[in-house]
Structure formats: structure tokens, C-alpha cells
């Protein structure tokens, strides 16, 4: 089983408007509400490709109940309830623009933080791969992901960690290492305090720095240029075909789903990289975030090339 972790989920609300009028009433005829958060995007994609997946994280209030009701029926809900209400994230789509209003979300108490650690530990026996995605809610220390990764490692589970900023830096500087991370160029630049380009020789040098020691897989998305990856001491360049991009949001989460799935199936290097990239591309071809059309899987998969560099 693959266990996904979303510590700060949301209800994503979309308001399409022809024009956003300031300081007056705006009426919306169509409203879209979906269970949101990076980890839940991963969860949806894993369910759509037929993997055995369960979802955990923190939920609360009426929004938490809505989130549970809107999970794919193939997903086992193993969430931990908190006193605060799961947040709303509002996107106003207007005049080919997108204005977002994001709630900070609930503040987690010490008892809730400790309670989730015990809950998480109880799930390790039935998991093989743990996929941790997104930001930490208020109240949790920046080192919280270190504790989750350590619990999973002690249980012998593989861990895919997709976060950024201080939370990622804390894990990388600790003695506890995830199996795989998926930083982009911007996140690499932030971690190292200098600009990192898409040049392959530079990426090879960057991923060989001591900060990344002990991590089995590092996969860097290069957008339309594919991806660059390091598996232990072997480097790969992934080339992808050109596609019609409809909505790129969630493609990184779909890539994480591919990494997690491939690890759970003990795939070889080339198969892992192709699966990760094809799912990211399939998401980009869909209007809905965290969704793939599996009918197009084989066609795109066969057009992806992976070479050792």
C-alpha cells in the first residue's frame, strides 16, 4: 500500500467571473469545490492508475467532512481529526487571470501534533511507500517532517518527500533521509542560496553537493525540457515529447504519484523515470488538477527517452 500524507489540506473553491469588480458585489453562477492539497492530488492520481492507496493527514470541522465525502471511493481514508476547521483556498478566475485567496488554516496544538505522530506510526505496518507532500500548518515545528520520515524509515518504508523551504532544508540537514525528493530549479536555488540553471553539468555538480548525501533518488523537473535525475551515483536525462498543455497545475504532484507507484512496484530506473514523467504530462493535458487520462498513458510513455549522462 502507498500512504499519502497531507498535513495542511484544503477545500479548493473556484469562482469563474467575466470581470472581477472591486468594492462591489460579484455574483457567481458556477462554483467548483474539490478536496485540495498536494498530497490529495497525489492520492487521486494513484487511485486513477489503480494503485492501492490510503490517505492520511489532519482534517477538522465541516470542511474536513466535505473532504472525506469527496475522496475517490478507491482511497482508504485514514485521517486524524483536529479541533480546527480544514481551510478554504479560493481561486477567482477572471479576464484570463487568477486571483487567489488562501486561508492559513488551523493552528495545530501540541497534543494534536503528538497524537498524529502516534497515529502515523500505527499505519506503518500496512504501508510500503509513504508520500509526504505540501506545507506544514501553523503550530507544527519546521522539523516535524524529520519525525515523520524517521518513523517511516524505522518501519522499513520508502519515503517520497515533496516540500520546499525551511521544512525541506531541515530534513536535508538532518541525519534522517527520505528515499526520493523532487525539487525544481527554483527550490534548488533557494536551498543553495545561488541561482541554479538547467545546464546538465551544473545540475550534476549541484546534486553531488553534501547537502544531498544519502538520498537515493533526486528528480529535477525541467518543464518542457523533461527532467534530470540522480539515482545514487548515476545521472539520467529524461526527454519528453511536446504536448498541448491545458493546465500544468498539479503536474508535479502527478510526478510524485509516479515516483511513489514505481517504488512500490520495485521498478527499474528507466521505468521509474518514464512513469513519473508520463503522469506529470497526462495531468498537464487535463483541465482538472490532479487528474490523468490513463487511455493516453502508453502512447506518451513510449515517446519518453531516458539516457545515462
From Swiss-Prot:
The EC code for this enzyme is: 2.7.1.144
InterPro entries in the record, alphabetically? Carboh/pur_kinase_PfkB_CS (IPR002173), LacC (IPR005926), PfkB_dom (IPR011611), Ribokinase-like (IPR029056), Tagatose/fructose_Pkinase (IPR017583)
Question: EC top class, in one word?
Answer: transferase
What is one Pfam family matched by this protein?
PfkB
**CDD domains xref list:** FruK_PfkB_like (cd01164)
Q: Which UniProt keywords apply?
A: ATP-binding, Kinase, Lactose metabolism, Nucleotide-binding, Transferase
The catalytic activity, as recorded, is:
D-tagatofuranose 6-phosphate + ATP = D-tagatofuranose 1,6-bisphosphate + ADP + H(+)
User: What protein am I looking at?
Assistant: Tagatose-6-phosphate kinase
Organism name: Streptococcus sanguinis (strain SK36)
